[in-house]
Regions:
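Long, charged, low-complexity, helical-prone intrinsically disordered regions
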Residues: 70, 148, 163-164
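Short amphipathic alpha-helical interaction segments
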Residues: 134-145
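A short, conserved structural fragment
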Residues: 148-157
Length: 171
């Protein structure tokens, strides 16, 4: 997470902890929550068993979703778009989808890996092959290198980041 300059905290420009301190704090938080019965199911989400966010799963699974209202974002049939943030334009019917982009299969592969590796479920290579009709050998080669350094692990065809691996992409 980052500080946005136009926010009160961003304008104060506080001194933030260095990357190592942030990583140590993150790992300590993961251990504390784990000891207290919370499962770490996504890089910045913890929940008691059975209480994972169902809403966010659509994003992590790259499913279609429709956002309605000013500033709402949608992803439908390989197309990403948003409505204007201006509520008056939205109410008057003048708000048409903007920031439209067609998302290529190649980009969707990258997004699949990016969002799935944020979750404890990880990225299933069989699922990736079936969705995008690609060889996963290059990805698996990278995962094996990460595994040697304790940053990734796998169960069958599913690869996921370890807590140490998550701490590096979290900061």
């Amino acid at each position: 997470l980052k500080l946005e300059p136009a926010t009160p905290m961003g304008r104060e420009n506080p001194v933030l902890p260095d990357d190592d301190t942030q990583a140590d704090t993150y790992l300590a938080m993961c251990r504390l929550l784990g000891r207290n019965g919370f499962e770490h199911y996504e890089i910045s989400n913890f929940a008691k068993p059975g209480f994972r966010s169902q809403h966010n799963f659509k994003y992590w699974d790259l499913s279609d979703y429709l956002g309605l209202g000013p500033g709402a974002h949608s992803f439908l049939n390989g197309r990403r778009f948003a409505f204007a943030r201006d509520i008056r334009a939205y109410i008057s019917g003048e708000s048409i989808p903007q920031d439209e982009e067609e998302v290529s299969d190649f980009r969707r592969q990258g997004e699949y890996l990016m969002v799935r590796l944020r979750t404890s479920d990880g990225a299933d290579m069989h699922d990736l092959e079936n969705r995008y009709h690609v060889s996963t050998a290059p990805y698996e080669q990278v995962f094996r290198m990460l595994e040697k350094h304790g940053l990734a692990a796998h169960e069958g065809t599913r690869w996921y980041l370890t807590e140490q691996g998550l701490s590096l992409i979290h900061i």
